[in-house]
C-alpha cells in the first residue's frame, strides 16, 4: 500500500514530499478545483504503483474510453472476459451438428449462371439471324431472360398492330439499308442559324447620319440620374433636396443637355453589337449557300433568289464599318427597307429548312419504324415459339427456386451457429450483463459482438442501427467508460468477487457531463467500490458536491480526505480535511480566499482562475436564493432586481459607481463562464461579490467566511 510520496515532480507539483501526518490510507478521497494539479497527482500515483506491480492496478481517467477501450482506427470496443455461468460441452456438439446441415450452394449457383448465359446466347443468335441488315439491337445484356422475353412479347403485339397476318410476320425477311442510310444522312444535315436580333432601324439611321463632337461626359447612368433628380426641383430653388448643398438649377440643366446631346460612345457600342451580329449572320449564310443543293434536293426547300441576299449583307457590313471607322461621318444612309426584308427572309429560310427536315425525318422514320417493328415481331415470334427455350427457362427457374430455399435455410443455420459461438465466448457474458445494465438505466445503447466475438460495437436498440463513438453524447461516453471500468473489476455478475490480481484503484473524475439520474447511479457504484475489498483506493474529483456525496457517512479509520491546493507561486501541495463543509460554504470560502488575492499573486500558467468564474456565479445564485424566490436572477437583464435587494437590505440606494460595477460583474460571470479570460478580472469579480454580500448581509458573510 502506498503511504507517502516523496520528491514528486509533475507539472505544478515541484519536488513535493508528503508530511508524515498526511500519509495515505486504504481509502483516499481527494478534492481539487480544476487547475490545481489534481490529475497530475493521480497520474503520478499511477506511475509509482506501476513501477512495482502494474497488473494489480486499475486506473480510470478522462480519456479511458479512447485510450483503453476503443480499438485503433475503429469504433469497436475491446472485449472483456467474464464467465458468469458454466459453459456446456453440448454447445460444441450442437455447432458441429448444425454445420453438417449447411449445404454449400456455390457450385450450383455457378452452374445456373452458366445455363442462363447459354440460353441468352441462343436467344441472341436467333435475333441476329432474323434481323438481316437492319440495325435492330440486341436486348440489353443487363436484363434478365424473363425481362427479355417480356420485351419480345410486347414487340410482337406492336408488330400485329401494323401487320395483322401472323404468317406474314413469321415469313418477313429484312433486307433494306437504304432507308437507314437516307435517314442518317438527313439527320446529320446541320441547319445554320439565320435569325438575329432585329435592331431599331430608326436608331441605326439616326446614328449613321449623326455628326458627333468629342466631349468628355459622365456615364449615361449618371446622366439619367441627374436628369431625373432635376425634375424634382424647380428653377427658383437654391438648395439641393438630396444633399442640402447649394443648387444652381440652370447650370446643371445646361450640363445635362450637353451630356444628352453627345451620345457618341453609347452609339459606337451599339453599332459594334450590330456589326458583330451581322458578321455572324454573314458566316451562317455562307454555310447555308455551301449546302444549298442538300437543302433543295434532299429537303425540298424552294430555291428562288436567295443567293442575292449576300449582297445586302455585304452592303450593311460596309456601311457599319465606315461609320465605326469615322463616327463624324454623317453622309451614310442605312438601307432600312433592304435590312427589314433581309432579316425577315433569312428567318423564313431557316424556319422552312427546319420544318422540311422535320417532315422528311418523320416520313423516313415512319417507314423504318414499320420495317423494324415487323422484323422485330418476326424475331419475337420465333423466340417465343421455340420449345427448347421455354423448357430450358422453366428448368432453370425451378432449380433457382430450390437453391434460394436452401440458401435461406443456410442463413438460419449460420445465425444459430453464430449465436452458439457467442454463448461459447468468454466475452459474451460481460456483453449480456452490461446490456442489462443499460436497459435498467433507460439508456438506449447496446453492445453487439463483432465477427471475432471478442470485441463489441455500439448500436441503438430502438432504431436498430450501428453507432459510431461520435454519435453519442459526452455524458453517454463517460457513463459507458465507467461501466466498462467498474464491471471489469469483478469475477461475478453480482459484483461480490473482485478479480484476484486487482489490488489498487485510481479513479479520476468519474462523474462528468452526467444528468442527475446517471450521476446518482455512478455515485452508488463508487460507494460499492468503497465497500469492496481492495488494498487501496484513490478517488479524485473536481466537484465539491460529488466529494460531499462520496464522503457522506463514510466512517472508520481506514479513510482520509484531502484537498489539492496551490500556493502563491503556483506550486501544488496536499492538505488533509478535518471536517467536510457543505458545498455552498466550501465554494464561498474559496471565493473569499480568491478575493484576497491581487495582481502579484497571479501565476501565468495557473488556469485555476479561469475555472473559478463558475464558482463565483454559483455562490451568487445561491446567495440570491436566500433573498428572492427566483434564484435565476444572476443575469445582466435582472440587474434592477439585484439593486432592489441591496436597497431593501441596506436601506440605501446603490450608487451609480456600484451600479456600473454590478453590471460589469454580471456580464463577466455569465460570459466568462463559457470561455477563459484575464485572471485579474476573475479576482475583481470575487472582490465585488464579497463586498456585495458583506453589505447586504454581514451576519451571513461572517458565518460563511470563517
UniProtKB/Swiss-Prot annotation:
Keywords: Coiled coil. It holds the Pfam family AAA_13. It comes from the Bacteria. InterPro entries: CR006_AAA (IPR026866), P-loop_NTPase (IPR027417). Gene3D superfamilies: P-loop containing nucleotide triphosphate hydrolases. Disulfide bonds: none annotated. Residues 86-162, 269-299, 337-427 form a coiled coil. The keyword Membrane does not apply. SUPFAM superfamilies: P-loop containing nucleoside triphosphate hydrolases. This is Uncharacterized chromosomal cassette SCCmec type IVc protein CR006.
